[in-house]
């Protein structure tokens, strides 16, 4: 979903369509200045800067369960976790190399967050979310090295098959 989607509507729609795509991923920045203004203008929090208190108990519990068992990933993009990111950034998903690399790994290879080098966390309420760990650069290098090895092995296999 777009980060500016209404949070409550997003949760309702996610409950209906979560089984159709491979995964649904939302990356949030709780200090996103554009989404602060959007919340004021639209009179409700946005998917990219959600306010869980807007949900009723059933929807809140569904989100906790979805984060643990379903094809839904919540990623926290905090400036404190992302070197050089402006804490109020709205363009971090394409402006920051860690986040844009994560987006590409998800879109091109359909990797789950752990496979992309992200770190699993849980809130006090049990909501599972993912963060960029301090050693993300090294984790990303390992992921990329694995992709290169896999591609090289596939190319070698293709070459053997074509010469037989």
Model regions: which residues?
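Lipolytic serine-hydrolase domain surface
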Residues: 2-161
């Amino acid at each position: 979903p777009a980060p500016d989607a209404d949070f409550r509507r997003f949760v309702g729609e996610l409950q209906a369509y979560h089984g159709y795509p491979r995964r649904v991923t939302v990356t949030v920045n709780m200090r996103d200045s554009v989404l602060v203004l959007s919340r004021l203008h639209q009179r409700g929090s946005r998917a990219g800067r959600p306010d869980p208190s807007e949900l009723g108990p059933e929807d809140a519990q569904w989100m906790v369960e979805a984060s643990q068992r379903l094809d839904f990933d919540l990623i926290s993009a905090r400036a404190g976790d992302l070197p050089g990111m402006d804490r109020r950034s709205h363009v971090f998903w394409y402006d920051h190399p860690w986040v844009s690399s994560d987006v590409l790994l998800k879109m091109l290879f359909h990797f789950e967050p752990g496979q992309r080098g992200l770190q699993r966390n849980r809130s006090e309420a049990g909501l599972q979310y993912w963060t960029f760990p301090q050693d993300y650069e090294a984790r990303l290098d390992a992921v990329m090295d694995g992709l290169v090895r896999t591609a090289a092995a596939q190319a070698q296999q293709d070459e053997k098959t074509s010469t037989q």
